[in-house]
UniProtKB/Swiss-Prot annotation:
Role played: Catalyzes the key reaction of chlorophyll catabolism, porphyrin macrocycle cleavage of pheophorbide a (pheide a) to a primary fluorescent catabolite (pFCC). Works in a two-step reaction with pheophorbide a oxygenase (PaO) by reducing the C20/C1 double bond of the intermediate, RCC. Belongs to the chlorophyll catabolic enzymes (CCEs). May play a role in senescence and response to wounding.
Renumbered residue ranges of the record's region Disordered: 1-61
This protein's name: Red chlorophyll catabolite reductase 1, chloroplastic
Induction pattern: Induced by wounding and senescence in leaves.
Keyword Transit peptide in record: yes
One Pfam family from the record: RCC_reductase
Gene3D superfamilies reported for this sequence: 3.40.1500.20
Length: 329
């Protein structure tokens, strides 16, 4: 789920996966967004952040959030989801030091933002989570943007997941899926309802047609097992000098596929309630908890402390654990 590792190196150069864009990116200091306001993953710096990140004379300037194409795509889709879900989402209650955070006591090489909106009582929504990370590394930077919308136990409908992992100006990893909540081999009717009837696989086929696309496989076998057979798990590599091509693909084919997948989820999953036997519901809840706990273990506890330090990482992970409804290990 929340992938906090750099993408695999591009085939053209061992270091290209972490090379910094040669194009001049727009730099966005973090901004705490108003509770209940429209989706924002970047903007003007609040006074609190300015105070915490002020560098002494001669000190290294604090890292700022870089505005890349996939963050704009994520903001647009988050706004679409919020507009559609409306009052089914409660205002954000994420504390300020988790809504915006950075490494090194304010002048480090990594910055991030996290926003979580819980589902209102009586809705099918468990939570909607948005996160954005920018980490400077020796040969460049890594930028990760995530949008998760998870459903609660009133329905067995799939969750929505979108994640972009960019470690190079010419390459990106994209993860897009309706995450299944049942063993698909044991429930062919589940495949038919949410994956065949919705024709969701057409989006994967379109992305796979890109000559720059190749399959992406997580190093974790468990993580691989959680995705559906229609998941878009692709690495897009545009090669040397392909910055403009990658941006066109992100704003074009990837944005189109992500919007189509979200629309399918909003139309076919978000409002669907399910009649289930108690044992069946308990098994689904258990499966959800295992997937959530394992994703935190694999992707967060092993990587976030290295990027932000233990104190910041502990605060952020605790907030995500709260959203996921899992206990600290």
């Amino acid at each position: 789920m929340l992938q906090l590792r750099s993408p695999p190196p591009a085939t053209s150069s061992p270091s290209s996966a972490v090379s910094f864009p040669t194009l001049a990116p727009r730099l966005l200091p973090l901004r705490r967004r108003r509770r209940g306001a429209g989706s924002q993953l970047g903007g003007k710096t609040s006074s609190a952040v300015r105070a915490s990140s002020a560098a002494a004379p001669g000190a290294t300037e604090p890292e700022v959030m870089v505005e890349v194409a996939h963050r704009e795509v994520a903001r647009a889709l988050a706004s679409l989801a919020e507009a559609r879900l409306g009052a089914r989402l409660l205002p954000s209650a994420v504390p300020p030091d988790v809504a915006e955070f950075r490494s090194g006591g304010g002048a480090g090489n990594a910055v991030g933002s996290l926003d979580v909106r819980r589902g209102a009582p009586g809705s099918t929504i468990d939570f909607m989570l948005q996160s954005s990370l920018h980490c400077k590394v020796p040969n460049g930077a890594i930028d990760i943007t995530s949008l998760l919308i998870f459903l609660n136990a009133s329905t067995d409908a799939p969750h929505f997941l979108m994640e972009f992992i960019q470690g190079s100006p010419t390459s990106i990893v994209v993860l897009l899926d309706l995450l299944p909540r049942k063993d698909l081999a044991l429930h062919p009717e589940y495949i038919e309802r949410y994956y065949e009837n919705t024709q969701v696989d057409k989006q994967r086929e379109k992305v796979e047609e890109l000559p720059q696309a190749r399959p992406y496989r997580s190093r974790s076998l468990f993580v691989r097992s959680t995705f559906s057979l229609t998941a878009i798990l692709m690495s897009i590599d545009c090669g040397q000098g392909g910055e403009g091509t990658l941006e066109e693909i992100v704003r074009g084919q990837l944005a189109t596929a992500a919007r189509a997948l979200l629309q399918i989820w909003l139309d076919s999953c978000a409002d669907h309630t399910s009649e289930m036997e108690e044992g069946e519901r308990e098994n689904m809840i258990k499966r959800d908890q295992i997937v959530r706990s394992k994703s935190i273990e694999v992707d967060l506890t092993s990587n976030l402390p290295r990027m932000f330090g233990p104190d910041v990482a502990d605060r952020v992970i605790a907030e995500i654990q709260k959203a996921f409804g899992v206990q600290e290990a």
